[in-house]
């Protein structure tokens, strides 16, 4: 049901932030050996919990399919959707408020080397596996039509099914955002038998989405994302969060040591940025831990 009144108050009373995400793509949202939710998208949820509740563990992750993303955020039953969600104007109008692009991705293709091709333009008449209810599916159709490739799409509801179909040879190629291809490909038994083709056929700006109808909550989540980015820009990392004046006006303002960037107007604590950065680190730390050297080892090109 849609929430009456302030979502921030509701979250504080509830004592946790509810995020719709996933557990099937390493780097973005998966389970570690102990069964904990980990990943880039999960850390964005933890950052919000740190800011609002002072506790990065005060989260509930609800796993949803790609095709369930719109209805889930429209219903207002979750506080935030963080599930590799591409910003589009129609989704922004119909689903919820896109907060900020936190990763710039682009769609690509992975194929088995035995197919003997080196370009996506050679996929004439091919069968390509893709997830339902995604921009990926729409882009594939556009790419096929534009280049007269007559590609057949084989669609599945969830990523695991797409990967299984590709690995069992039901399709010639598998298409997804390039970072997800790298992540999922890293888990293949014979990784070296597969190549990601050079073409990037779309722009995929990924970021969190919040329900329509609560500007305060939208602003809070936007501010949390900004803290991650500015923390890195100002050289503040999880291991070096000062609690007394540094003499650097911008750092002191961000950390709530001196001055303000408007925390009190938003209803978050003066030192919320300290809580966020201590708990999850800055943008670069989150990237490196999940998508970079500590995770799926994706080079940080135009990531943010």
Where are these regions (language model features)?
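Short helix-initiation/N-cap motifs at beta->coil->alpha
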Residues: 4-5, 59-71, 115, 153-168
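Bilobed "Venus flytrap"/periplasmic-binding protein-like clamshell domains
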Residues: 18-27, 37-52, 86-87, 104-163
